[in-house]
Amino acid sequence: MVNNVVSIEKMKALWHSEVHDEQKWAVNMKLLRALGMFAGGVVLMRSYGDLMGV
């Protein structure tokens, strides 16, 4: 069989360790929230940025 660089079992183990560990989950949620706020800010400025020009 072909040796994959990243096997399915390694991906499952990574997912399990990131989701089911409370400390890592809290950090991941903070990161996702920050990413969402950034993306929302970019969309807001692209949509309504011309109204903010002085």
Swiss-Prot record:
> Which N-terminal residues, if any, form the signal peptide?
none
Q: Give a yes or no for keyword Membrane in this entry.
A: yes
List the stretches on the Cytoplasmic face of the membrane.
2-30
Primary subcellular site in the record, as a coarse category: mitochondrion
GO biological process, alphabetically ordered: protein transport
Query: Which InterPro entries would you find in this protein's record?
Result: TOM5_viridi
Q: Which UniProt keywords apply?
A: Membrane, Mitochondrion, Mitochondrion outer membrane, Protein transport, Transmembrane, Transmembrane helix, Transport
Indicate yes or no for the key word Transmembrane helix: yes
GO cellular component terms, alphabetically, are: mitochondrial outer membrane translocase complex; mitochondrion; plasma membrane
Q: How does it sit in the membrane?
A: Single-pass membrane protein
Query: Where is it localised?
Result: Mitochondrion outer membrane
| Segments passing through the bilayer | 31-48
The organs and tissues expressing this protein are described as:
Expressed in roots, flowers, young cotyledons and leaves.
Described function:
A component of the complex responsible for the recognition and translocation of cytosolically synthesized mitochondrial preproteins.
Can you tell me which family this protein belongs to? Belongs to the Tom5 family.
What subunit structure does UniProt give?
A: Forms part of the receptor complex that consists of at least 6 different proteins (TOM5, TOM6, TOM7, TOM20, TOM22/TOM9 and TOM40).
- The protein depicted here goes by the name Mitochondrial import receptor subunit TOM5 homolog
Gene transcribed to yield this protein: TOM5
